[in-house]
Amino acid sequence: MKYIGAHVSAAGGVENAPKNAGLIGATAFALFTKNQRQWKAKTLTEKSILGFKEACRTLGYGPGQILAHDSYLINLGHPDRESLEKSRAAFVDEMERCQQLGISLLNFHPGSHLGRIDIDPCLATIAASINLALEQTQDVTAVIENTAGQGTNLGFDFSQIRTIIDQVEDKTRVGVCLDTCHSFSAGYDLKSEHGFHQTFETFDRVIGFDYLKGMHLNDSTKAMGSRVDRHASLGQGTLGMAPFERIMKDTRFDNIPLILETPDPSLWASEIQQLRAFL
């Protein structure tokens, strides 16, 4: 089964996210459980929590079809101790919010060294941050998203993600979300048929499909290897539609949330239909 959806708005309360997903014919969805550009947020009310769970039940969204996304402000590899502790506390809060809502997957960007520490110590700090969060929470998997490698962001190379996973103590609660735009911008060829198969052979060898918990399906405005993160609507960028057809026809991508983060929400319903037509 292919679970296809988009990162929908939770404006007015998290309980609105499942409804917004239903309106575009989605069988999966992503959401922010709080304002993604603020450190602090009001605690979730009992009304919102019950409303979210009831909407998911009514519309048929199980935990494996929902991929929460954490705040953009969080940097679990921050070289400054005070800023790191602030990020770690915010990440635990994000995990706890997922726990309250019955969401089992929290997607996050691994972190950045900011040009102030070497890569390996930064990766170790990210892993330590994950360990601390997992110790303080339960039932939620920390899902590392690969990045485009823009600026000093880490996680653009599969081996960097593997290094983080190797240092996470509870391997049952860590996973990976692959973003097609990020992968392509980081230099992984998803466009050609040979490159597509080679990329996922590499992913399986270095990380392993057992860790794949979700995907972001985005075209890219930039060339392969550009290390620039700019999403495009499906078929309107440098990737084209072929990679997305391959993903739809490949059973390795079954039973995980496949989430659009394409820039035009008015196209999401038709993009979902396009993807379904490949099945």
UniProtKB/Swiss-Prot annotation:
Gene3D superfamilies: Divalent-metal-dependent TIM barrel enzymes. It is an enzyme of class 3 (hydrolase). It catalyses: Endonucleolytic cleavage to 5'-phosphooligonucleotide end-products. GO terms for biological process: base-excision repair. One of its GO terms (molecular function) is phosphoric diester hydrolase activity. CDD domains: AP2Ec. Zn(2+) 3 binds at H182, D229, H231. Its EC number is 3.1.21.2. Pfam families: AP_endonuc_2 (PF01261). The keyword Zinc-finger does not apply. Binds 3 Zn(2+) ions. NCBIfam families: nfo (TIGR00587), PRK01060.1-4 (NF002199). PANTHER family: APURINIC-APYRIMIDINIC ENDONUCLEASE (PTHR21445:SF0), ENDONUCLEASE IV ENDODEOXYRIBONUCLEASE IV (PTHR21445). HAMAP family: Nfo (MF_00152). Endonuclease IV plays a role in DNA repair. It cleaves phosphodiester bonds at apurinic or apyrimidinic (AP) sites, generating a 3'-hydroxyl group and a 5'-terminal sugar phosphate. Belongs to the AP endonuclease 2 family. This is Probable endonuclease 4. The lineage of its organism: Bacteria, Pseudomonadati, Thermodesulfobacteriota, Desulfobacteria, Desulfobacterales.
